[in-house]
Amino acid sequence: MTEGDRLLNTKKLTHEIYAEYAAMNDRFHDGILQASGNSALIRAVALNNKLPFAPASATLPMLSTHVQDHDWMRYAHRQHHMLLEALKRGEGARSQALAIEHTEVAQINMRAALAQRAQSAPQLPAIRLVVGG
């Protein structure tokens, strides 16, 4: 968590910071998954992660202005903090609600990418595989 805090405590998000954050983000999500001890869930997520835009960091960088990017990434990372605390306290229902809400950030980003295909395509060339063009 401190690595993510450090990366997002900058004035400007560079491609290097995005890459470092994405790696940290993937480790965080994998750590939560592994800690579940649910082998069926682990296998299902592994299969899901082979789909376009499905893995945890698939839609990074965000597809908006740099200021909005920073705000969204800070929001998503704050959700990481809240989820981890809820899990530590054994708050199952809250953890589930936070995890579901956390997926909304990716969905918002994907909707923005689809709405702004011309601007999004250079950042995420694979978007053409999903929506054509």
Question: How would you label these PLM feature ranges?
Answer:
Residues 1-62, 79-86, 94-106:
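Conserved amphipathic alpha-helical segments that form helical-bundle/coiled-coil interaction surfaces
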